[in-house]
């Protein structure tokens, strides 16, 4: 089994918790949640800068696709990832 980067494991756990209470959301709300929870490295991204915004977007999408694959392996949830909406649903 693949071992995760320690940063990614923490992000996936926090995303799973967040989606448990907000099954339909968007990328901005996810990033703001990760920043509010001080999840590294999101706590250091400055969304007002192009580099910070890109880094937050890239890492958020990367983590969401890892979470989607995890949900598929566990046959637990489906995760729909669109440019303006993210939705978790029971299978």
Predicted regions, residues:
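Short "pre-J" leader segments immediately N-terminal to J/J-like domains in DnaJ-family
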Residues: 2-91
